[in-house]
UniProtKB/Swiss-Prot annotation:
EC number: 4.-.-.-
Phylogenetic placement of the source organism: Archaea, Methanobacteriati, Methanobacteriota, Methanomada group, Methanococci
Name of this chain's protein: FeMo cofactor biosynthesis protein NifB
Cofactor annotation remark: Binds 3 [4Fe-4S] clusters per monomer. One cluster is coordinated with 3 cysteines and an exchangeable S-adenosyl-L-methionine. The two others probably act as substrate.
Organism field: Methanocaldococcus jannaschii (strain ATCC 43067 / DSM 2661 / JAL-1 / JCM 10045 / NBRC 100440)
Enzyme class label: lyase
SUPFAM superfamilies, A to Z: Radical SAM enzymes
Needed cofactors: [4Fe-4S] cluster
Length: 300
């Protein structure tokens, strides 16, 4: 990325714990789990909602938060954890595939204008919604890019739901890659700050991750390479060793700065890494039944 543009973003990235390692353990963030539905089927992804969702990883949330509860929930969070600077939407599905995401962002923009607005997405719909995100004053967007070669990506993503149709295998992979790259470039031109997350899967994309960095280096502020958590249809695969992770990050760092302090957080994460109970307490205090949905109601 151009150094002048990086400097332009400094006032935001210096206080965003997922873009700046130096303040990762000092500045808090809150994830609002308002987006349950997803439009792609990653073979390593198993979303969990409800009381059984006790794991601390992406795709997991105790509950789906409704937009009408966002204001009171954020008021509680900010009262208890005043070092919160960033509010993000990271699932448990794909943010851009859920209308509740945009309803929530509008509420935040009106009621909490001083919070940095952030979201995570698989990027399939980014080229459709990048301008809407900018208009809602979203500042940072994280896009998960696991391959830019369809032959590799088809081993990671089983299907893609796009344009009212399910696309399997290489067909779906091609659509996803094309939309991701197009969306990232358009978001960059709109002055959105882009981070890419890449899941390192040794037996599938380890020798390919550097190609992602080369391809996107002019449009991405930072890259976050995270180890595979062997789940779902990749439960038989191994995660990378520390040495493998280190080596791939060093190779990619020649092209894009690397983020090395990721906690692979839940969709309802709040505060610093250790602070995880606010959402449950919030619903108990409201004497309200948890708004939990069965995953069968949503596409993967």
């Amino acid at each position: 990325m151009d150094k002048n543009k990086m400097s332009k973003f400094a006032h935001i990235t210096k206080v965003h714990p997922c873009f700046n390692e130096k303040i990762h353990d000092k500045v808090g963030r809150v994830h609002l789990p308002v987006a349950p539905r997803c439009n792609i089927a990653c073979k390593f992804c198993r979303r969990s909602l409800g009381k059984e969702a006790c794991e601390h990883r992406p795709g997991v949330a105790l509950s789906v938060l409704k937009p009408e509860d966002v204001e009171s929930y954020l008021n509680k969070v900010l009262k208890e954890i005043p070092n919160i600077k960033v509010v993000g939407i990271a699932g448990p599905g794909d943010s851009l595939f859920n209308k509740e995401t945009f309803e929530t962002l509008k509420i935040i923009d009106e009621k909490f204008p001083n919070l940095i607005k952030c979201l995570s997405t698989n990027g399939l719909l980014l080229n459709k919604y990048y301008k809407k995100l900018a208009d809602l004053n979203v500042k940072t967007v994280t896009v998960t890019v696991n391959a830019i070669d369809p032959e590799i990506l088809k081993e990671i993503v089983e299907w893609v739901y796009y344009d009212k149709k399910v696309h399997y295998g290489i067909e779906g992979a091609k659509i996803l890659i094309e939309n991701q790259i197009d969306g990232i470039k358009k978001a960059y031109d709109e002055d959105l700050i882009i981070k890419i997350n890449t899941v390192l899967i040794p037996e599938i994309n380890m020798n390919h991750v550097v190609d992602i960095a080369k391809e996107l280096k002019d449009f991405v502020y930072i890259q976050n390479i995270i180890p595979l958590i062997p789940l779902y249809k990749m439960s038989h695969l191994r995660p990378p060793t520390c040495e493998e992770l280190k080596k791939v990050r060093e190779e990619c760092e020649k092209y894009i700065p690397q983020f090395r302090a990721c906690g692979q957080c839940r969709a309802d994460a709040v505060g610093l890494i250790k602070e995880r109970k606010i959402l449950e307490e919030f619903f108990k205090e409201k004497n309200k039944k948890l708004n939990v949905f069965e995953l069968k109601h949503f596409s993967h």
